[in-house]
Each structure stands twice: as structure tokens, then as C-alpha cells.
Design a protein with these regions (language model features):
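Conserved PLP-enzyme active-site core in the AAT-like
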Residues: 5-12, 16-171
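A glycine-/small-polar-enriched, mobile loop at the entrance of the PLP active site in fold-type I
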Residues: 1
Length: 171
């Protein structure tokens, strides 16, 4: 956690596991009964919002935890209005994907501001974003609630490792 500027951190079995844990944490929180209930999300907020240009194969990690993927960014109005309009009582989190080929017309800070206005956490997939080392702290500093990094790739650790960092109540 100290290297990311986050309240808490956890070594996970790869960045994909970090995405699964992000979804589970945002849906079940610290409630032991809800944690054991997953992937059955009955009675829980279970939608993860993802920007249309951020759709990717690793969404299965969120779905494995029981989440439903809801795309935003194809409607009328500004992107900020579209994101705000996509958030509802079933929204567990908004995900933001960083990496080559994943442009976003809203900055992470803008997404965080909109999501937090609705009391919805923002989770970041930063698996491919190391180096530079500055990214270890950037996403938390920009307001993300949870961030996942690959322990392989630029970190040069074992390919089967990852880092999950963020709010203590979600890690």
C-alpha cells in the first residue's frame, strides 16, 4: 500500500484476479454473508459500468464474481451526462481501463467526480500501465477507490502475480 499511496494493498494471483476481487468487494463489501453468497448477487448492487471504448476480454473477471456489465457512452448528450445517467440503484462500481488502445474522452478525475457524487466507487484496471513507476500512485491520487496492476509485465515479477490497492474497506 505504501508504494501506491493507498490505504491498503493486497498481492493477488494476477491482475485478472484483482479485477475479480474489485467486483466482489464493491458488490459484497465487508459483509461475510454477502461474500459467501457470491457469485449469486440477489439483493446486492451488481452492475459494473464500463465505457464503450473500454470493453475488453477481461470483463469475464467481473462477471465471474457475479457482476453484470453495463456499457455507457453511446447515448445522447455529453459523456458526463451519459455516465451520470447510467448510474442507478444497482450500480456497484464504475470501471476505468488504462492501456494502449483504450482511449477515454473523460479523464479519470472526471469519472471519479461523477461516480463519487452518486456514492459509487471507481475501480481501475492498470494491469498494463507499469512502467512508468509514477502510475503506482497516480490513479489513487486521482481518486480511484481500487486499482489493479500486473505483477508481471513492467514490474518484472512472476506473471501469476498482481497488486490490488485502494480503500481499506474494499481491500
Amino acid at each position: 500500500a505504501q508504494y501506491t499511496g493507498a490505504e491498503a494493498g493486497l498481492v493477488v494471483a494476477g491482475a485478472s484476479t484483482g479485477l475479480l476481487v474489485q467486483a466482489a468487494a464493491c458488490m459484497a463489501g465487508q459483509d461475510p454473508d454477502r461474500i459467501l453468497q457470491l457469485p449469486d448477487t440477489a439483493g446486492m448492487k451488481d452492475e459494473i459500468l464500463i465505457y464503450k471504448k473500454h470493453r475488453f476480454g477481461f470483463e469475464i473477471c467481473y462477471r465471474t464474481a457475479g457482476a453484470k456489465i453495463k456499457e455507457w457512452g453511446r447515448g445522447e448528450g455529453s459523456l458526463a451526462e451519459q455516465l451520470a445517467g447510467a448510474i442507478n440503484e444497482d450500480t456497484a462500481a464504475v470501471t476505468y481501463v488504462f492501456g494502449p488502445g483504450f482511449p477515454c474522452d473523460l479523464s479519470l478525475r472526471e469519472v471519479v467526480a461523477i461516480a463519487h457524487e452518486h456514492e459509487v466507487p471507481v475501480v481501475v484496471d492498470g494491469a498494463a500501465m507499469l512502467p512508468p513507476a509514477d502510475n503506482l500512485t497516480k490513479y489513487i491520487a486521482d481518486g480511484a477507490d481500487l486499482v489493479t496492476f500486473s505483477g508481471g509485465k513492467g514490474v518484472r515479477g512472476p506473471q501469476s502475480t498482481g497488486i490490488l490497492a485502494g480503500r481499506a474497506d474494499l481491500v
